[in-house]
A protein has these predicted regions:
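N-terminal secretory signal peptides and thylakoid transit peptides that target proteins
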Residues: 2-17
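Active-site-adjacent substrate/metal-binding segments within catalytic domains
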Residues: 37-156, 169-214, 274-282
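Polysaccharide-binding and catalytic clefts of secreted carbohydrate-active enzymes
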Residues: 83, 91, 185-193, 204, ...
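Loop/turn elements at helix/coil->beta-strand transitions in domains of secreted/extracellular proteins
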Residues: 94, 137-141, 156-159, 214-220, ...
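Aromatic- and acidic-residue-enriched segments that line the glycan-binding/catalytic groove
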Residues: 154-181, 223-264, 418-430
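Glycoside hydrolase catalytic-domain groove-lining segments
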Residues: 282-289, 301-307, 311-375
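Substrate-binding cleft of secreted/luminal carbohydrate-active enzymes
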Residues: 378-423
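Aromatic-rich peripheral "rim/lid" segments of glycoside hydrolase catalytic domains that contact
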Residues: 409-464
Length: 464
């Protein structure tokens, strides 16, 4: 790890920097894929490298909101833009940015269960000790797929989210779905939002799944995970099998949309890239109006966070226009970016005009002894390098002034012996604890260095 100095342009590839930002970095070796033949060095900013920044902890309330910045209290979380920076406001009315962890749950494998019994004895004790672990490293929340039921009963609580599965559940009923690495796949990439039964399903599903509409610690809901939005989605819809009754509503919706846009005789040969992106927005608008409408009817108090946009959807202006229209905060899973890309963030700002919450990002450590062949996160040599990646990525998020939080993926490593998991979670060092619940202390120490200075860093970035 070597310390170097770079110009502001080199540092963030065009991300606008505040006057306070420092042009100092360290170099961290990484691979985007474990199969890459060699390591590449990436300029990496850390808390320690920020010229002029002085670490300072800020007093916080029980939710993690800063006591020195106040807004209107509603008893629940909500977003607010103040002085050109987006924040969450916690139930007591204090400005809040969420530092959370995905999949904060006991492991389900035989090895995990035996380790939990040895270390904690009971799931209740695990929940209490895990909240202590997170809080002691300045995390103030949990993310998707966490053990909500157990963590709700812990003596001390953390803000949390709830993961729902509107489309994957409905699609499964239609026999349209299959497992892909990391998320549900749909036949022909056609999500069945145009099916005549989907609106009623959304209403019933939301009413059934909402179980804590008055809980102030609940931040909000993810409606699904990583829905498809390929650039050629319109082409795929127009080519769907007309004899397939489950996907026929999607094909007809695409045909009708194209006819309304370009004339009754328009076909695939008349489609251009502007049409393709507009169609993505059309599909997402249909999905979002139904799911957010059903959620807000069942629970008007908590935030709609959306389906955790990922992949090519992150570059779609039309998808982000639709997301900004219907979501309170836009959940995004970001992979393949050492820092959040400047042009992408500016597009989100222009099109959505809403804040974002990073709901997955991570790096795996080569020193863990895992093969690390599964999952989309970066590969770095050591646990200390994982912490440096965390600091660099989060600093880029904070500097955007659009980010109201992040969820590291994830709490626990994959157990290579557990073959019941989804194929993207088989053999990799994604956790902050090992499969026997032993913490990766070098990683956690580096995370704490940033988390503990979270509000001081935003103040430093916003000055001048």
């Amino acid at each position: 790890m070597n310390e170097l100095r770079f110009s502001r342009r080199t540092l963030l590839a065009g991300i606008p920097l505040s006057a306070a930002a420092a042009p100092r970095t360290v170099m961290v070796r990484a691979k985007r894929k474990p199969s890459d033949p060699s390591w590449t060095e990436y300029p990496t900013r850390t808390v320690e490298s920020l010229d002029g920044f002085k670490p300072r902890q800020t007093a916080a309330d029980r939710y993690g909101g800063r006591l020195d910045r106040k807004a209107r209290a509603t008893g629940f979380f909500y977003p607010i833009e103040r002085d050109r920076r987006w924040w969450l406001v916690d139930p007591e009315g204090h400005l809040f940015i969420k530092a959370g962890v995905c999949s904060t749950s006991p492991g389900r494998s035989k090895n995990n269960k035996e380790a939990l019994a040895r270390k904690f004895g009971t799931v209740e004790r695990w929940a209490a000790e895990t909240v202590k672990l997170l809080r002691s490293h300045a995390f103030n929340g949990t993310g998707g797929w966490s053990d909500v039921a157990s963590l709700r009963q812990a003596p001390a609580r953390l803000p949390y989210t709830v993961s729902m599965n509107f489309l994957s559940t409905f699609g499964r009923e239609l026999k349209l779905t299959f497992q892909q690495p990391g998320h549900t796949g749909y036949r022909g990439d056609a999500i069945p939002v145009f099916h005549s039964a989907f609106p009623a399903f959304c209403e019933t599903y939301a009413a059934k799944m909402v179980d804590a509409p008055r809980d102030p610690f609940l931040l909000g809901y993810f409606s699904d995970n990583e829905l498809p939005a390929p650039r050629d989605w319109l082409d795929k819809h127009l080519n769907l099998d007309p004899s397939d009754e489950a996907t026929l509503p999607s094909r007809r919706a695409a045909e009708n949309w194209l006819s309304a846009r370009k004339g009754a005789k328009a076909g695939l040969a008349d489609v251009n890239d502007e049409d393709r992106d507009a169609f993505r927005g059309f599909v997402y608008e249909r999905y979002l109006t139904l799911t957010t409408g059903a959620l807000r009817k069942a629970d008007p108090n908590h935030l709609c966070l959306g389906p955790r946009l990922h992949g090519s959807a992150l570059r779609s202006p039309a998808v982000f226009r639709a997301a900004g229209k219907y979501l309170d905060v836009i959940a995004v899973n970001i992979y393949g970016q050492w820092s959040p890309a400047a042009d992408m963030l500016e597009m989100w700002r222009a099109e959505a005009k809403r804040p974002f919450l990073v709901t997955e990002f991570y790096a795996k450590g080569h020193d863990s002894g895992f093969p690390n062949t599964t999952g989309a996160g970066w590969l770095v040599p050591t646990q200390k390098d994982r912490a440096l990646f965390y600091q660099n990525f989060v600093l880029g998020c904070l500097e955007s002034k659009l980010c109201v939080g992040w969820h590291w993926f994830k709490y626990m490593d994959n157990d290579p012996e557990d073959l019941t998991t989804d194929p993207s979670n088989r053999d990799s060092n994604k956790g902050m604890v090992r499969i026997d619940y032993t913490p990766y202390q070098d990683l956690l120490d580096g995370m704490k260095e940033l988390n503990a200075n979270l509000y001081a860093l935003t103040d430093w970035m916003d000055r001048g």
